């Protein structure tokens, strides 16, 4: 089964570095890194705003919890927004591709 993870990063370089690490560790099959977005948020009871870089990571569902834990460890934010879910539907070729992710770790 295919799983996706959404996570914003402080900048492009950080997203690329962490994405490369997760690829090398065979935890993900792909990271799509977007352009800058404007974020408005509440943190520690105060309103804030800033620029972030969104990323969508693709993995196999059996690795979802491991990817989230590793991403949280690598991420520079104190409490990064990491949202993961199992896909209800995907192309069969996508399932086959991501089924091979992490196979050498098992």
Indicate where each model-derived feature is located.
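Positively charged, small/polar-rich N-terminal and surface patches that mediate targeting and assembly
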Residues: 1-106
């Amino acid at each position: 089964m295919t799983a996706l993870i959404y996570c914003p990063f402080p900048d492009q370089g950080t997203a690329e570095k962490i994405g490369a690490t997760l690829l090398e560790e065979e935890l993900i099959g792909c990271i799509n890194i977007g352009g800058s977005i404007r974020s408005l948020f509440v943190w520690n009871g105060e309103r804030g705003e800033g620029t972030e870089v969104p990323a969508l990571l693709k993995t196999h569902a059996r690795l979802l919890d491991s990817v989230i834990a590793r991403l949280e460890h690598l991420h520079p934010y104190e409490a990064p927004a990491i949202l993961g879910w199992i896909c209800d539907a995907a192309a069969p070729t996508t399932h086959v591709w991501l089924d091979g992710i992490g196979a050498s770790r098992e």
